[in-house]
Amino acid sequence: MPLELDLQVASAAPDLPSEAQFRAWCELALRQRPESELTIRLVDEAEGLELNSTYRHKDYATNVLSFLADVPDELLDIPLLGDLVICAPVVAREALEQRKPLQAHWAHLVIHGCLHLLGYDHIDDAEAEEMETLERELLAELGHPDPYACDDEEPPSKEK
C-alpha cells in the first residue's frame, strides 16, 4: 500500500504547492516507512496561532506543527503516522524574509514535519545535527539549496 495523503486546504493562499508536490515530498521523507497515512492541513495564521498556543504554549503562529498518531499499531487497520499542520502565510513570509525560493521552503517544511513524525527532533545539538543533515540530503535530491545556509551576516530564524 503506498502513501495515503489527505491534503486539507483550510486556508487558500497564493502559490500553494500542488497535491502531487506534497505527495512527492512526503514520499521522499518517508522512504523508510512507505506505507503510511498522514494528513497535511494548510491553515491561516489564526488557526496556526491557536494550535501553537494550545499544544506548545507559544503565542505565535509557527510554520509547521507535527502531531504523531499515538495509537498502538495493533489497534489500527491502517498505518496511521500522524498529521502536519502548516501555516501558509508563515511559510510565504519566511521564504521572503530568508530570501529562499518559496517551493524549496515548502519542500523543506514538509520534509521537516515528516521527519518529526518519524521520531527525529532538534531539541539538543546532536539530534539537530542528525535531522538537519538528513534534511539537507533529501532537499539536495530535489535540487534545492541547503535550507540552513546563510548568505548574510544574520542566520535565518529557525522555529521549532
Curated annotation (Swiss-Prot):
UniProt-listed PROSITE patterns: UPF0054
Primary residence: cytoplasm
A cellular component term, taken from the record's GO annotations: cytoplasm
Subcellular location: Cytoplasm
InterPro entries: MetalPrtase_cat_dom_sf_prd, YbeY, YbeY_CS
Role summary: Single strand-specific metallo-endoribonuclease involved in late-stage 70S ribosome quality control and in maturation of the 3' terminus of the 16S rRNA.
Name the record gives this protein: Endoribonuclease YbeY
Protein's organism: Pseudomonas aeruginosa (strain LESB58)
